[in-house]
Amino acid sequence: MKKTGFIALLLTLFIAMPMKGQIRGNSINVEVIPDHQDWRYEVGETAIFNIRVTREHTLLNNVKVDYAAGPEMYQDVKKEGVVLKDGTLTLKGKMTKPGFYRVDVKTTIDGKEYKGACGAAFSPERLQPTTVMPQDFNEYWQNAISEARKVDLNPTKRLLPERCTKDVNVYEVSFQNIQWNWRTYGILCVPAEAEANPAKAKCYPALLRVPGAGVRPYGGDIYTASHGAITLEIGIHGISVTMDQKVYDDVFNGALMNYWNWGMDNRDDSYYKRVIIGCIRAIDYIEQYTPWNGEQLAVSGSSQGGFLSLACAGLDKRVTCYAPVHAACCDHTASLKGVACGWPHYFYWNATPHSDYKSENKGKGQEAKINTSRYYDGVNFARLINDKQKGWFSFGYNDDVVPPTTAWATYNTVTGPKEISPYQATWHYWHQEQWDEWENWLLKTLNIER
């Protein structure tokens, strides 16, 4: 091809390409920066918070902010319309007992709200949960699992050729859960060599991925499977996980709206009973119908999935390692004592007004729900984890959905081998480095070489 023709071709391709830049971040930012790099303090120590409002990293003058400060979920200092002449403000705070002191700052500029926060940890290693473990807790759950196993798994398996790679075969699978025809659906990813070579049967570690709250489709963990593991990513609602997103949106906003509140007056009626049993039956499926080696089995998830990770590890000793990330459903009853409680904050909103947490009437009329909550509290499952199960915990100090108070308290209850890796500035989401560390920990703990 002549040079002029080649240049013309390049110009044609360039013009034909859509010119669309990515949208990332904001020009305006609200920063709340503690004076300790690790965001940690001892009880009684004073934390200093430096607040900055910037546009393109340059301080904004005469900007108005509102702020709230104090123990997380119970902030007792609130100011509105504070003018920052040079774009900065300094606040101080301290705690007289272990916990998190949280500062929230927000401003509105050109009609848009911007916010920042900082949750400072005060002696978090001393935090202890409030929830009580019922005497029959483990017995109740083991009996429920035994009853469910009287129902055959009766599995189904459908190849998804459009998702398969040269290294991984991908299937949608389902199996019966707690009773006849109540099914759990998921995406199973199996190394292709496992099915091509019978000699490779029962040679692979396995990872069960459990979901966060909501209703959605799932793609399966092809990446981990490509490194030589069986992965099963499950949904919890008894419906296929390969339909169009609109189906799940309609179900979530209709038939399954607020499912986490269902049946809280009785431990046998809670929606989460079939969810937890379904997770254990997913492990049964892995054991009976995949080339799992019977030795290394991980379970992991975030938010609701973090709670389910704790439940699996606590109830099933086939689980050798678990990785809960900003685990929800931990220490439900903490708000009855004026302490930050785990999502979905059952008694923070639904008991007497949360502003009146010191009242002797706190929780009155909620006795049945309080008792049920103890059977569905991640803390009590964590108490069952033994010294042969390795754990990796991660969460953010700015999380306003799953308070770090509950995450630390749950971590402190575990007596087995464990690691903690907080990413302080995260809210209820992941940082890329956090995701990478989680992924690397799972592969290493499952003895998978990259």
Regions found by a protein language model. Give the residues of each.
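C-terminal catalytic histidine-bearing segment of alpha/beta-hydrolase fold enzymes
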Residues: 401-450
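Cap/lid segment of the alpha/beta-hydrolase catalytic domain
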Residues: 202, 215-277, 334-341
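Short beta-strand/loop motif that positions the catalytic acidic residue
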Residues: 385, 391-395
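Proline/serine/threonine-rich low-complexity linkers at boundaries of modular beta-sandwich domains
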Residues: 22-30
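N-terminal cap/lid segment of alpha/beta-hydrolase-fold proteins
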Residues: 35-39, 149-201
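Active-site nucleophile elbow and catalytic-triad environment of alpha/beta-hydrolase enzymes
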Residues: 365-382
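Hydrolase active-site cap/lid region
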Residues: 306, 310-364, 422, 430
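Gly/Ser-rich "nucleophile elbow"/oxyanion-hole loop immediately N-terminal to the catalytic nucleophile
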Residues: 197, 201-202, 257-303
